[in-house]
Regions:
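Bacterial Sec-dependent N-terminal signal peptides
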Residues: 1-19
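A non-catalytic alpha/beta surface segment that caps or lines the substrate-entry region
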Residues: 49-101, 105-107, 111, 122
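Active-site metal-coordination/substrate-binding segment of hydrolases
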Residues: 100-197, 202, 438
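Acidic/histidine-rich catalytic neighborhood of metal-dependent amide-processing enzymes
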Residues: 152-243, 286-311, 319-326, 454-455
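Acidic-enriched catalytic cores of C-N bond-cleaving enzymes acting on peptides and small amides
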Residues: 240, 262-305, 312, 329-354
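Zn-dependent metallopeptidase/amidohydrolase metal-coordination segment
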Residues: 315, 389-446, 450
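N-terminal capping segment at the start of a domain
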Residues: 26-58, 161-162, 361, 420-426
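Active-site-adjacent substrate-binding region
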Residues: 271-292, 296-300, 362-415
């Protein structure tokens, strides 16, 4: 099926390329101005332990209102812009052609990670980069010899944006926001650009794993035919698959007794039972032993549960476990293995009440629901814009993966596409303005390529 889609796609490339409008409608300086306006709004999200809470900072509200007003000011016939109560921004641009073609939903997020300092961001512009070290006032140096900054060696003569070294920059994912809003502007202001329906969703709390929690799957009405998640951090790769992520929680309920009379008094040693449980997981399944397309099992937390008042229950223990896998058969194996581990604990420690809560689907593999034509389309769209990209299996999750897990019936899997962010979640974070312009062209190519696919 994928081969047929590829042949149809290649056969239409000449037509597709001819329909792409000339670039340069939005200047590089305007792109820089847009990106700087976003990163100056401090929109760090808050990482609360509860998976049901959805905290919102003033900065998150501010950037959502800013982008909403920016897009509203662009006008556009039939263009709908919505700012939700949870400060998601939804943009719906209708098709301007008669032919029915697949719709495209682009995604990015407006919040910034809380994992690095994010107050008092002072972006710095380094024009005509000379290929050497970039020394920042905050005392850190961005060097092309550092793996985080190795891509700098490819960008001699370009314009690099950093923080002052005391905070992160916010390129994750305000590069994606800048690219997509520029795409929106070009679609609105250039009626000669023929396209199908294009939608954009900018989410909140992605960097704390909650982007899908308040997404409104009804806001666009119909299910999008394909999704592109503009939040990638590897300039020469795009994802075609990612881990399925399952969260498991195991409770071990104990009671104190004098250990000298432990059997008689039915001593429930929850600590030893929980430790025994963790030790039953084969070490070859630990993340430290896995790579490539191999999944893993990670018992990553052992702690006392909290009562309603927030006080620790010292007799009991909670073990939290991550299951990660690409292949559904491996996932079935992991779940069965953990069931067996639990049964062995129940047999070995009959006085301890050992039980598991319901599994929590954290994110799903995009490969299961991604249309066959998407990977080759993305690769060619990038190539035509001047970027060579290769497929990757992402050992993690994305906004699209979270959406697919929460809304499997209305959200297809979407490729995670490079947004221009580098050294994310750190004070070394940086972006290249010229790359953002190239990425706008790449997203334009995707929009145009869709018109060659039969819906």
């Amino acid at each position: 099926m994928r081969k047929i889609a590829l042949l149809l796609f290649i056969a239409s490339c000449i037509i597709c390329k001819a329909q792409i409008p000339a670039s340069g409608k939005v200047s590089q300086e305007k792109m820089l101005e847009r990106f700087l306006s976003y990163v100056k709004i401090e929109s760090q999200s808050i990482d609360e332990p509860s998976m049901t809470s959805f905290p919102m900072t003033d900065g998150q509200r501010e950037i959502a209102r800013y982008i909403y007003n920016e897009v509203k000011g662009l006008g556009g016939k039939g263009v709908k812009v919505n700012l939700s109560d949870d400060y998601y921004v939804y943009i719906d641009i209708p098709s301007n052609i008669k032919k029915k073609v697949p719709s495209v939903l682009f995604m990015a997020h407006m919040d910034v990670t809380p994992e690095a300092p994010g107050n008092g961001i002072k972006p710095m512009i380094h024009r005509n980069y000379d290929g050497g070290d970039i020394k920042l006032p905050g005392g850190i140096t961005l060097s092309p010899n550092n793996p985080q900054c190795a891509h700098l060696k490819d960008l001699v003569g370009k314009t690099i944006v950093t923080s002052d070294g005391t905070t992160l920059l916010g390129a994750d994912d305000k590069t994606g926001c800048a690219v997509l809003i520029t795409l929106v502007e070009e679609l609105i202001k250039n009626p000669k650009f023929k396209h199908g329906r294009v939608m954009v969703a900018l989410s909140q709390n992605e960097d704390v794993g909650k982007a899908a929690m308040r997404y409104d799957p009804t806001v666009f009405g119909d299910k999008p035919d394909m999704v592109i998640d503009v939040d990638g951090s590897t300039f020469d790769q795009y994802s075609i698959a990612n881990f399925t992520a399952i969260g498991q929680t195991y409770y071990f309920t104990g009671n104190k007794a004098h250990p000298s009379y432990g059997k008689k008094e039915q001593y429930a040693d929850a600590l030893t039972a929980a430790s025994f449980f963790i030790g039953l997981v084969p070490p070859e399944m630990n993340p430290s032993a896995r790579e490539g397309k191999e999944g893993y099992i990670h018992c990553y937390s052992l702690a006392h549960p909290l009562d309603e008042s927030g006080k620790s229950n010292v007799n009991d223990y909670v073990v939290k476990v991550r299951l990660r896998y690409f292949d559904q058969q491996e996932g079935a194996y992991q779940k069965k293995l953990m069931e067996d581990c639990l049964q062995k604990v129940q047999t070995a420690f009959p006085f301890v009440e050992a039980q598991k809560t319901d599994d929590q689907m954290q994110y799903e593999n995009i490969a299961y629901s991604m249309p066959d034509y998407v990977p080759d389309m993305v690769k060619k769209a990038a190539r035509d814009a001047g970027m060579e990209m290769r497929e990757k299996y992402a050992r993690g999750g994305t906004t699209s993966a979270m959406m697919v897990a929460r809304f499997p019936d209305v959200m297809p899997g979407g490729s995670d596409f490079y947004s221009g962010q580098n050294a994310e979640h750190s004070c070394y974070e940086w972006a290249c303005v010229e790359e953002l312009m190239v990425l706008v062209n790449a997203t334009e190519n995707i929009v145009t390529s869709v018109m060659t696919i039969k819906n």
